[in-house]
Amino acid sequence: MADSPYPTRNYFPGQFVVSAGSILFRRAPESGKLQICVLYHTIKDEWLLPKGRKDCGESIETTAVRETYEETGYKCKLLPCNMSTRAPAHGVHTKDMIREAEQITEPIAITVRDQGLDGVKIISWYISELDGDGQKVEGTQMDTESFASQFINAEEAIRTLTFKGDQDIAAKALEIVRHTGTI
């Protein structure tokens, strides 16, 4: 049996966790400026993006929307955007190559976090927007979560995030949203 010519690592049940989150956008009611919703972890003193583990039987897109709502308190939906992707159009066979796609809700980033002996955490990141009346709902977090959510003007929100990886993901989301121009 031959080995793959590409560096390959397999993870089996118990060696990985699948997670998803989103960068939640809105237009500020007063100024119309783009804002991003960030989380302040009140115990760890960290500014983060909303994300969490996928439930059994749940799609990764549903996870992103659910976790964003649970952690921020804002109902949201995935925002169709124009972006580069290697995913083919539905039902169309094409060569594996980068292409520009319009109005898609694919992940804008994948984070693979090495967790040492616990394996890896794989996080799919999406772009979302407010759904419904845009009012915050209290009491959506799990008992073990201690987040305060806040919409901040997009550029400032990116600088506010504690970790560079989160900053890079939020910056890419902002670039895609501005390129699409739909919010």
Where are these regions (language model features)?
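C-terminal helix/juxtamembrane-tail motif
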Residues: 171-183
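A short, flexible beta-alpha/helix-coil linker loop
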Residues: 44-46, 157-158
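Short, solvent-exposed loop/turn segments that connect beta-strands within catalytic domains
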Residues: 28-35, 116-119
